[in-house]
């Protein structure tokens, strides 16, 4: 077998009559398998002259003629045909020589099968329901797709079309060719998945873009009620989320568990995706599944994030909720409100807000009493759910400090966007909630800081 693998004709001849040409190894492969797989014409000819069994299958059902088609050796395939090899033989998966050639883009083999052997009947489905055309699409064999010109876009057993197979495996050239050949775009398989959904689910960004540009609908739901936005939000693929949003993917679609893309991304801590969805204006009031037996109320994305202990995302969602409530109450405002402060719900690390953030920290950790932050939150129209979500993280005797600090930073976010005077607002609210001592200290420190800046 080693001699056949190396095309070592001298050794094969030296072994002479003592050579058992039909000996098999543990994989049930003979020397002919290795000679053919290595595209070793001389060794193949020698073995055929010694009356080797040309149709011997290995443990996977692969005969030498399969290997000739698989590795694209037309000369050796012809030798095997002349030696009487079974031309319709199939392996354990139902693959014949045409399937093998199609998978590996060996167009000359397929042309020989169709034109010389006159065996178009080999153009049939394997055990998975895939015809050679579909297999060529699945493996990105674009030249093969061009010569298999029969105009069909047949679905396989699970309903996957060639476009599904090419898209989910990331074969951009094949996807583009199939889009040119066929008018169909949004066929679904048995799971209700389109080619676009499968491409997105497998993070094939180039294919997703090609399909979207060709007019594929990103909002077709699967049997599980998922749109293409669900799997990419769950996996945290922010570039694909952005791409789908640019092509009008609906943000508020609920799957079978009534989860939106925001529920999934919030629960798994996908901060970048959460930011994109919040900026897209996702509905924050949507609740996931209500469990009737346990009488458990469905949760909003905020509740899901709080349960998952995703502190940053909890604060982002509260900021978004307060921001959109403010915008709704002030419809006269337009996008110019973001000219100085671009919209973001992430943590604020800007130098120009450093003093205000320092004031918020001192107030929360050194000046406010345990229930003071809640009184401020109530005055600033924080909802009960928002307050509860803040309280879900951190417990203990001094946890109110962290809770108050987070609440103040969330409040500051909207004040900055509204372009108010946060220091003045804070002073007035502290007076209203009975914290004159804290208010005076904050104002005095702010004045001293201002004087220091002027002197310097």
Q: Language-model features: where?
A:
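Ankyrin repeat domain, specifically the short helix-to-loop turn at the C-terminus of the second helix
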Residues: 13-20, 45-53, 79-85, 112-120, ...
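Conserved ankyrin/ankyrin-like repeat signature
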Residues: 11, 42-43, 75-76, 108-109, ...
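Solenoidal tandem-repeat scaffolds enriched in leucines and small polar residues
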Residues: 83, 87-174, 181-185
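Ankyrin-repeat-protein effector appendages
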Residues: 151, 181, 214, 247, ...
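Ankyrin repeat boundary/linker residues
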Residues: 25, 58, 91, 125-126, ...
